């Protein structure tokens, strides 16, 4: 058996092998003697692989300081933006040469807290602050202020032009402005205590029919509102009034209409009377239908009597004026229509004219 003394592969790990270890290695190699020795190409490949790995490690060591410098530059840019924003928001005129003590401490703290590079790249250059960005921002700020003032002046001009635009003229508005101008002139001239304003009310012509349709006109109500300065402010208000005119009735505006309470009371009374008239008409129709039912059942047993009542007219079959006291409307006996008609609107119209006149 031929014994060959070879240098073990793990020479880097075992610098000084012992005699027992070398003996054991030779025994193991003799046992595996059937396998051929490793070729030279495999050894070259291993060496080439080790060289590539060492080169990649060296490149990583060179690239890591570059990444670290980039992170430091990003932190520096972020801190610079924060300081610029704080300076512009507070509008302070402090000098722009270098960092303050708190800013430099925070900057060094961030650089220390970042990933530690190898010993060769721990010494880092100090950042240099330039004022070029500050000058550009200082130039842009007055431009923005000038644009804001320009837009504000344009908005004020447009608002003043809108105020000068004339409102559409209406007769009611012209009358209201005229009355208000009279009252303001009276307030400015204290010597003239007595001023009388007359409001003309145009009467509508009488219609040729029995009852004209409802005509509406405007009634000016002058109200005084006390103010804190002691002077009285007057305002004009127009209220619609519905009036029913007859042929024989002439409309005159009483003085009581100037009082709003009296007008409300008259309106309430008129509504109440109208409601009572409608209720009476309903009761009258109800009694008529009941009577008609009774007469139809007994019509075969009752003989006609032409001389029954000489005072009755053609419509006495519909309305018997003698029996109106039973339903409580005896007072409306004279106003009820008894001339060949059963229309309720005519009856209500005649009753309403009787109440108003």
From Swiss-Prot:
GO terms for cellular component: plasma membrane. Residues 1-146, 208-233 are annotated as: Disordered. Residues 129-139 have a biased composition (Polar residues). GO terms for biological process: auxin transport; auxin-activated signaling pathway; positive regulation of auxin mediated signaling pathway. Keywords: Auxin signaling pathway, Cell membrane, Membrane, Transport. Residues 88-104, 112-127, 208-223 have a biased composition (Low complexity). InterPro entries: BG1-like. It is found in: Cell membrane. Signal peptide: none annotated. Residues 75-87 have a biased composition (Basic and acidic residues). Belongs to the BIG GRAIN 1 (BG1) plant protein family. Involved in auxin transport. Regulator of the auxin signaling pathway. This is Protein BIG GRAIN 1-like A. It comes from Arabidopsis thaliana (Mouse-ear cress).
